[in-house]
Protein backbone atom coordinates (compact mmCIF):
# COMPACT_ATOMS: atom_id res chain seq x y z
CA UNK A 1 0.00 0.00 0.00
CA UNK A 2 1.28 3.47 -0.76
CA UNK A 3 1.50 6.37 1.65
CA UNK A 4 -1.42 8.34 0.21
CA UNK A 5 -3.14 10.61 2.66
CA UNK A 6 -6.91 10.38 2.44
CA UNK A 7 -8.65 13.54 3.52
CA UNK A 8 -11.60 15.66 2.51
CA UNK A 9 -9.24 18.29 1.12
CA UNK A 10 -7.18 15.77 -0.87
CA UNK A 11 -10.39 14.40 -2.39
CA UNK A 12 -11.41 17.84 -3.61
CA UNK A 13 -13.88 18.65 -0.83
CA UNK A 14 -13.36 22.29 0.15
CA UNK A 15 -15.88 23.34 2.76
CA UNK A 16 -14.74 26.94 2.42
CA UNK A 17 -16.14 26.88 -1.11
CA UNK A 18 -19.07 24.54 -0.47
CA UNK A 19 -20.62 26.06 2.64
CA UNK A 20 -21.50 29.49 1.16
CA UNK A 21 -23.27 27.74 -1.72
CA UNK A 22 -25.14 25.49 0.70
CA UNK A 23 -26.31 28.53 2.67
CA UNK A 24 -27.38 30.30 -0.53
CA UNK A 25 -29.28 27.17 -1.63
CA UNK A 26 -31.07 26.98 1.72
CA UNK A 27 -32.10 30.63 1.46
CA UNK A 28 -33.38 30.17 -2.09
CA UNK A 29 -35.24 27.00 -1.12
CA UNK A 30 -36.82 28.74 1.86
CA UNK A 31 -38.44 31.18 -0.54
CA UNK A 32 -40.15 28.24 -2.26
CA UNK A 33 -41.50 26.68 0.96
CA UNK A 34 -44.97 28.21 0.50
CA UNK A 35 -45.32 26.02 -2.62
CA UNK A 36 -45.91 23.06 -0.30
CA UNK A 37 -49.27 24.63 0.52
CA UNK A 38 -50.47 23.81 -3.00
CA UNK A 39 -50.25 20.18 -1.93
CA UNK A 40 -51.80 20.61 1.49
CA UNK A 41 -48.43 20.52 3.21
CA UNK A 42 -46.17 22.87 5.10
CA UNK A 43 -42.54 22.71 6.03
CA UNK A 44 -41.22 22.38 9.52
CA UNK A 45 -38.96 25.40 9.21
CA UNK A 46 -36.63 24.36 12.02
CA UNK A 47 -35.61 21.31 9.99
CA UNK A 48 -34.22 23.32 7.07
CA UNK A 49 -30.46 22.81 6.92
CA UNK A 50 -30.55 20.02 9.49
CA UNK A 51 -29.76 16.36 8.95
CA UNK A 52 -33.24 15.66 7.58
CA UNK A 53 -35.84 17.97 6.04
CA UNK A 54 -39.32 17.58 7.52
CA UNK A 55 -42.71 18.69 6.25
CA UNK A 56 -46.22 18.16 7.55
CA UNK A 57 -49.06 16.75 5.49
CA UNK A 58 -52.67 16.44 6.64
CA UNK A 59 -52.21 12.92 7.98
CA UNK A 60 -48.51 12.65 8.78
CA UNK A 61 -45.08 14.18 8.92
CA UNK A 62 -42.64 13.23 6.15
CA UNK A 63 -38.89 13.50 6.09
CA UNK A 64 -36.22 13.45 3.42
CA UNK A 65 -32.49 12.79 3.45
CA UNK A 66 -30.14 12.65 0.50
CA UNK A 67 -26.80 11.06 1.27
CA UNK A 68 -23.94 10.18 -1.02
CA UNK A 69 -21.13 7.72 -0.47
CA UNK A 70 -18.85 10.52 0.70
CA UNK A 71 -15.14 9.87 0.64
CA UNK A 72 -15.24 6.32 2.00
CA UNK A 73 -14.67 5.11 -1.53
CA UNK A 74 -11.12 6.53 -1.41
CA UNK A 75 -10.24 4.17 1.42
CA UNK A 76 -11.96 1.24 -0.28
CA UNK A 77 -10.08 1.87 -3.51
CA UNK A 78 -6.77 2.01 -1.63
CA UNK A 79 -7.56 -1.21 0.26
CA UNK A 80 -8.71 -3.26 -2.72
CA UNK A 81 -5.19 -4.15 -3.90
CA UNK A 82 -4.34 -5.23 -0.35
CA UNK A 83 -7.49 -7.23 0.48
CA UNK A 84 -8.75 -8.25 -2.94
CA UNK A 85 -12.22 -6.97 -2.00
CA UNK A 86 -13.99 -3.85 -3.24
CA UNK A 87 -15.56 -3.08 0.15
CA UNK A 88 -18.38 -1.30 -1.67
CA UNK A 89 -20.95 -3.62 -0.11
CA UNK A 90 -20.03 -2.32 3.33
CA UNK A 91 -19.73 1.27 2.08
CA UNK A 92 -23.32 1.00 0.83
CA UNK A 93 -24.48 -0.39 4.17
CA UNK A 94 -22.66 2.39 6.02
CA UNK A 95 -24.27 5.02 3.78
CA UNK A 96 -27.75 3.65 4.44
CA UNK A 97 -26.93 3.60 8.17
CA UNK A 98 -26.02 7.31 7.96
CA UNK A 99 -29.38 7.99 6.28
CA UNK A 100 -31.17 6.17 9.10
CA UNK A 101 -29.18 8.16 11.68
CA UNK A 102 -30.15 11.43 9.99
CA UNK A 103 -33.82 10.43 9.98
CA UNK A 104 -33.89 9.21 13.57
CA UNK A 105 -32.60 12.60 14.72
CA UNK A 106 -35.93 14.13 13.66
CA UNK A 107 -38.00 11.17 14.89
CA UNK A 108 -38.51 9.60 11.47
CA UNK A 109 -37.99 6.06 10.25
CA UNK A 110 -37.08 5.13 6.67
CA UNK A 111 -39.69 3.78 4.29
CA UNK A 112 -37.85 4.55 1.05
CA UNK A 113 -34.09 4.94 0.68
CA UNK A 114 -33.04 6.62 -2.54
CA UNK A 115 -29.84 5.23 -4.06
CA UNK A 116 -27.75 8.25 -4.97
CA UNK A 117 -24.60 7.05 -6.72
CA UNK A 118 -22.75 10.19 -7.84
CA UNK A 119 -19.78 8.44 -9.38
CA UNK A 120 -18.79 11.31 -11.62
CA UNK A 121 -18.38 9.25 -14.76
CA UNK A 122 -20.33 6.37 -16.26
CA UNK A 123 -17.06 4.50 -16.75
CA UNK A 124 -17.00 3.90 -12.98
CA UNK A 125 -19.80 1.38 -13.47
CA UNK A 126 -17.69 -0.65 -15.91
CA UNK A 127 -16.02 -2.31 -12.92
CA UNK A 128 -18.86 -4.80 -12.52
CA UNK A 129 -17.57 -6.33 -9.28
CA UNK A 130 -17.45 -2.92 -7.59
CA UNK A 131 -20.82 -1.80 -9.01
CA UNK A 132 -22.52 -5.08 -8.09
CA UNK A 133 -21.07 -4.96 -4.57
CA UNK A 134 -22.45 -1.44 -4.18
CA UNK A 135 -25.94 -2.47 -5.30
CA UNK A 136 -25.88 -5.69 -3.26
CA UNK A 137 -24.83 -3.83 -0.11
CA UNK A 138 -27.49 -1.16 -0.62
CA UNK A 139 -30.19 -3.81 -1.04
CA UNK A 140 -29.00 -5.72 2.04
CA UNK A 141 -29.08 -2.55 4.13
CA UNK A 142 -32.60 -1.68 2.96
CA UNK A 143 -33.77 -5.18 3.79
CA UNK A 144 -32.18 -4.96 7.24
CA UNK A 145 -34.00 -1.73 8.08
CA UNK A 146 -37.33 -2.71 6.52
CA UNK A 147 -37.27 -0.11 3.76
CA UNK A 148 -37.29 -0.22 -0.01
Question: Could you tell me what each predicted segment is?
Answer:
Residues 2-42:
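N-terminal amphipathic/basic leader segments beginning at the initiator methionine
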Residues 34-148:
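Glycine-rich phosphate/pyrophosphate-binding loop regions near the starts of catalytic domains
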